[in-house]
Amino acid sequence: MENKINVVMLCGRGQSSNMMFNGIAHHANIVGVIFDNKVSTKIMARRRIKNLGIIKVVGQVSFILINKLLKRVSMSRITQLALSYDLNDAPPHENITTYVDNINDEETINLLKKYNPQAVVVNGTRIISKKVLSSINAPFINTHMGVTPKYRGVHGGYWSLAMNDSENCGVTVHLVDQGIDTGEVLYQGFIQANENDNFNTYPIHQIAKAIPLMKAALDDARNNCISIKEGVLPSRLWYHPTILEYIKHWIQRGVK
């Protein structure tokens, strides 16, 4: 492909970021990858307790702990899906990789100005500050594992199925603003999960669907023809399920 777009990636540390990197690596000229450090569990818990209350958060933490075991059980299915979708989770080469304590640090801004990309691909970071978003003249484009704005927040694929809304089980590629998954929609795609899938395998279907959508968004950015599309309403912010919510939806709807 001629005249590849110059891209910087701002990423969380994890499998989906590596898969996105490798998925677009031959389509774009990725000049730098900046990995965000994970927000501490203590800080996250304090925020959740303030917003949701301690009982809800205890239920969420209980689910997160149980899900570590469920993820181990799901590894064979995850591997199977990654192979079937030809997904590669090898990390980016060290010579283009930088690790920062916080994606909103001055170091990130300095790197963005140094690289001066035509677009910034975002995957799995904390909320990006206005100072970072305005530091360069380039679109910041995020992959969200859910259909926005109806399934903002986390685990949008799971929640759409748990709410008996399988037609809106999908993924969104959108511009980044200062809200939580509130940026304008560029592309959306939908997935088909089956009885072999669960909480830990839905994201594999979603990242596979997202990669070609991100490529299309980068083509639009390269050609200066980004087009905004309507999302799916109503808007709602979702969090981790509690252990009781997870069990309830598994029993009532077979959503694991």
Range-by-range predicted roles:
Residues 1-256:
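One-carbon transfer enzymes
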